[in-house]
Amino acid sequence: MTPRDRRRFDEQLDWVMARMPPLVHELIEKVPLHVEDYPSDAVMDEMGLQYIDELCGLYTGIPIGDKSVTHSGVMPDVVTIYREGILSTAADRRGEINLDRLRDEIRITILHELAHHHGLTEEDLDRLGYG
């Protein structure tokens, strides 16, 4: 990923976050948002991925409904979004990035991963249009 691509992505992420409802900002205070270029080798192996642009985001943690006192001392919940995956999803056949589509993909990915924090499954998200 070039510094220009990273900068362009981050500018659009800032644009999207500035327009998210206050509730989303409150959630991100509790479940931090990390931004990486692509998933680590460990994440790719664990998820059975072959290409770095296959994954747009990942929720790591224990969903709210599954938490109990026995989960004290575990790593904190985190939402990670991956620039390469989101840029790939927002690109047309020629590899050109449509800014509106990029913004939509960033927003959808963040909301999708926050929904996992609240216990929604991939099937639930598909039904809601956030799959």
Stretch-by-stretch model annotation:
Residues M1-E105, H117, T121-D124:
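Active-site rim/adjacent substrate-binding subdomains
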Residues E123-G131:
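Short, highly charged C-terminal tails/helix-capping segments
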Residues T109, E113-H117:
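Catalytic glutamate of the conserved HExxH
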